[in-house]
């Protein structure tokens, strides 16, 4: 069954990336599209006229389209950018392919006047409306190619990593890995970069390692991702629960993770309370305390998590080692040898 683009973005928060961009308006230096001309302006007007003549357009969106026309005519690019961002967030605009049409027939006509990273972020949001992941991938790859210029490398990294997300969804692990390696080198070359770019990078890297069951690498990358976003503002409750679940499983199965303090202290773990995974938090605390009795009491719950159930011997061994570490830690310094 072909994956949809909306499914691909069910967990990405980072993809809600219109925040963390310091400048909404742009100048010629910010452009990664050819300069708009009279034909572009006319095309944009024709599109808006066509939309406003459509009786099926929701009433709550008509004010947006009317303001688009007015602000475009007055060349108030900053205000127009803000209106477009608001439109893309509006629940009534989520019907497919409203975002795609707006981007292709209107946003592109004044793209040179938008900050390149804001424009790229708009493209990421638009990609969610493609019905098939392959179409979303082609769209983002086109934008990534257009931004592969010295002055727009941060936007190029953002778009490349979001394209890599769809490559991962389509099972193309080698292309995903290639994008990760290339973008890592680009990020290392930057003096500074907006959090939205790092968030996209770490999120996709984390999901790549999750797909390969590389627990420690997933754990490390997803904590870096969480550090780049406002969790409550950018992740739904369901996304937070899934993230806390995945981090918990990775902490338990990671063969180099013997300290759960970072996870136990992170607000994301509280999302498990009241969920079907609440017992995972209890299990983490049992491991962190080296509490074998608590582990045995929770052992029947592992049947609901096949990955944990398949690694019970490893978990016992890990708990014994963590219990030893806990015991040594609490011994007085005079008793240690």
Predicted segment positions?
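Eukaryote-biased activation of long, low-complexity terminal tails and linkers
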Residues: 2-139, 160
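Start-of-helix signal in alpha-solenoid helical-repeat scaffolds, especially tetratricopeptide repeats
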Residues: 100, 114-120, 154-159, 197-200, ...
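Short coil/turn linker motifs that delimit alpha-helical repeat modules in TPR/alpha-solenoid proteins
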Residues: 151-152, 192-194, 234-236, 312
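Alpha-helical scaffold segments of alpha-solenoid architecture
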Residues: 212-337
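Amphipathic alpha-helical segments of tetratricopeptide repeats
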Residues: 141-148, 181-189, 224-233
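"A position-specific structural signal for the A-helix of alpha-solenoid helical repeats
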Residues: 162, 166-169, 197-211, 246, ...
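TPR-repeat structural position
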Residues: 130-133, 173, 215
